[in-house]
């Protein structure tokens, strides 16, 4: 094949390249066989190069170029070797550039997807950080509120401590004043104690002198020492007369002093010396002041003695006790005399009847001692006044001689009264039990022990508990009047649009159920949002609003990722195009799936490529 027979079919080309003519000298000089071989080799190389170019074109989806052999040259354009080589180089560079651009586009797509994934991660991280920032903001708000509460509490504590310090300072001042007052009182009491000790010492001396004078007078009169009751009575008489003599002596001294003062006054009136009169008046004033001080001291001591002395009621009781004791002493003396007489008379006759009488006397003595102790309890100053009235008012109906010997008949009505009071304690216990069941039914009372009986302490305890409960109820519960109750009902009707009173209770039940539903919903929201149970409704509403904002932002971002950064009109246009072309594309895709006998859209392109390869 000659150089002129190498024809290439190329798409529309307007090349003006000229053919290189072969010199006749060279063609003649070359050997025809060598020339033909060289041409064949060049032709094969060129065909191989074009085959490689066709392979590149086919890989990029273009139709291959065909080499034409021996045909009419009118429908073809012929290139020389250089232009064909340039064409091959141009096509090769174009294919390489397209592959490079495709790889670059692929890399750009991969980097775009990677950037999208990173952007999604960053957005998720930003949302997480925003949520965390919101949580931290809530924590900071709660901490600020707690800090404010703690500051308020600390301020309140400081104010309370300052007030307490002021109160303590006032109490300290009051205590100091009281301490000073107590010190003054103690000094006064020490002075009074010293004066009283002096007075006691003086009275003790006077008592000793009185006893000595009594004994001396008694020894002078009777020539013996006092040892019996009559001797004591005689000593009392001696003391009585001695006191009268002492009073007369004091009165006589007072009269003598008054007479001497009158004489001084008369002497002063008679003397013409004025200075002497003034001096005597000054002396009299000093003496009168000293006497007034002495009299004031005596008055105070007498007042204290009067305060320390017993009352009239106590004196009566003491006198009665003295009389009873005198009677008991007389009885004891009589019993001792009888026992002594029996011992002296019947020393030889010690038989059983004497022993029985002796035992009976001892038993009577023990009974008498028991009655004396009961009588002392009855006439004790600590005993109630009603017992004294009972013992005084109810006179015995028996013989007067027996009453004078015994003197315990008044104890019988008192003991009867005691028995009646003790039996009435059971009735009082029952009535208090009924009253306690009415007032304080939640208190359980202990059962009454029949062996021990009813005690006054138990009754007092029951009354105290009832009083405490009644006072607590008065303090805690204040019963409203009818006007306030009517105002409450009318206010409820206005709030909840209730026309009649019959509809109040159904509306209250409805409000209660709605309130319960709302509380349950709020509690569920708190659990879902992981909030504290003590958080308010404002916090719940704010957290729900923040969640809605986050969800709306995520939805808008997802729409932007799907549709791209375009405006609303372009999105509407794309949606209209989708509605217009998607049915035809769906029908075409379904037909392809049926023809190719496949189930997935992603498998269409590989199946078509296989068919294309098989067609070649």
Swiss-Prot record:
Main location: cytoplasm
Annotated S-S bridges: none
Residue stretches in coiled coil: 96-210, 273-335
GO terms, biological process: cilium assembly; regulation of microtubule cytoskeleton organization
Subunit structure: Directly interacts with tubulin-gamma; this interaction determines centrosomal localization.
Function noted in UniProt: Plays a role in the organization of both preexisting and nascent microtubules in interphase cells. During mitosis, required for the organization and orientation of the mitotic spindle.
Protein name: Centrosomal protein of 70 kDa
Gene name as annotated: Cep70
């Amino acid at each position: 094949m000659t150089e002129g027979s190498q024809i290439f079919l190329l798409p529309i080309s307007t090349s003006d390249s000229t053919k290189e003519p072969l010199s006749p000298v060279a063609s003649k000089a070359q050997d025809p066989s060598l020339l033909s071989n060289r041409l064949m080799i060049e032709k094969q190389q060129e065909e191989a190069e074009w085959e490689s170019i066709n392979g590149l074109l086919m890989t990029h989806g273009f139709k291959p170029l065909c080499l034409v052999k021996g045909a009419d040259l009118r429908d073809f354009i012929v290139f020389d070797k250089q232009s064909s080589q340039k064409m091959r180089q141009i096509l090769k560079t174009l294919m390489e550039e397209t592959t490079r651009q495709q790889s670059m586009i692929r890399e750009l797509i991969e980097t775009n997807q990677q950037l999208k994934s990173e952007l999604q991660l960053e957005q998720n991280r930003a949302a997480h950080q925003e949520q965390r920032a919101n949580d931290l903001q809530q924590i900071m708000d709660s901490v600020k509120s707690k800090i404010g509460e703690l500051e308020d509490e600390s301020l309140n504590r400081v104010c309370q401590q300052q007030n307490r310090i002021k109160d303590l300072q006032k109490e300290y001042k009051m205590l100091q004043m009281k301490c000073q007052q107590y010190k003054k009182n103690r000094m006064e009491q020490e002075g009074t104690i010293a004066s009283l000790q002096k007075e006691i010492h003086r009275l003790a001396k006077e008592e000793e002198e009185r006893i000595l004078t009594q004994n001396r007078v008694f020894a002078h009169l009777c020539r013996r020492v006092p040892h019996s009751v009559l001797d004591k009575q005689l000593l009392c008489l001696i003391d009585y007369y001695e006191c009268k003599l002492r009073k007369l002596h004091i009165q006589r001294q007072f009269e003598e002093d008054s007479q001497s003062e009158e004489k001084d006054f008369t002497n002063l009136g008679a003397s013409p010396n004025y200075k002497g009169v003034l001096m005597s008046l000054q002396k009299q004033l000093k003496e009168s002041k000293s006497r007034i001080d002495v009299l004031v001291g005596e008055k105070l001591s007498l007042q204290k003695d009067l305060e320390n002395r017993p009352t009239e009621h106590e004196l009566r009781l003491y006198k009665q006790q003295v009389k009873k004791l005198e009677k008991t002493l007389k009885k004891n003396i009589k019993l001792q005399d009888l026992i002594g007489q029996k011992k002296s008379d019947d020393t030889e006759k010690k038989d059983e009847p004497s022993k029985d009488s002796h035992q009976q006397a001892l038993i009577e003595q023990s009974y008498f001692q028991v009655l004396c102790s009961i009588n002392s309890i009855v006439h004790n100053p600590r005993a109630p006044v009603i017992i004294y009235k009972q013992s005084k008012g109810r006179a015995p109906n028996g013989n007067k001689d027996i009453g004078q010997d015994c003197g315990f008949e008044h104890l019988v009505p008192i003991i009867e009264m005691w028995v009646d009071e003790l039996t009435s304690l059971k009735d009082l216990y029952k009535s208090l039990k009924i009253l306690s069941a009415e007032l304080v039914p939640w208190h359980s009372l202990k059962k009454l022990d029949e062996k021990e009986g009813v005690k006054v302490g138990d009754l007092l305890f029951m009354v105290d508990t009832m009083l405490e409960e009644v006072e607590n109820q008065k303090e805690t519960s204040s019963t409203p009047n009818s006007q306030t109750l009517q105002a409450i009902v009318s206010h409820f009707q206005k709030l909840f649009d209730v026309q009649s009173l019959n509809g109040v209770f159904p509306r209250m039940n409805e409000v209660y159920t709605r309130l319960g539903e709302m509380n349950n919903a709020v509690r569920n929201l708190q659990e879902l949002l992981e909030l504290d149970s003590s958080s308010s409704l404002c916090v719940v509403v704010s957290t729900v609003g923040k969640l809605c904002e986050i969800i709306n932002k995520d939805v808008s971002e997802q729409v932007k990722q799907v549709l791209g950064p375009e405006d609303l009109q372009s999105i509407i246009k794309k949606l209209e195009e989708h509605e217009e072309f998607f049915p035809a594309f769906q029908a075409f895709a379904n037909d392809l799936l049926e023809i190719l006998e496949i189930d997935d859209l992603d498998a269409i392109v590989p199946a078509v490529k296989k068919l294309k390869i098989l067609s070649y």
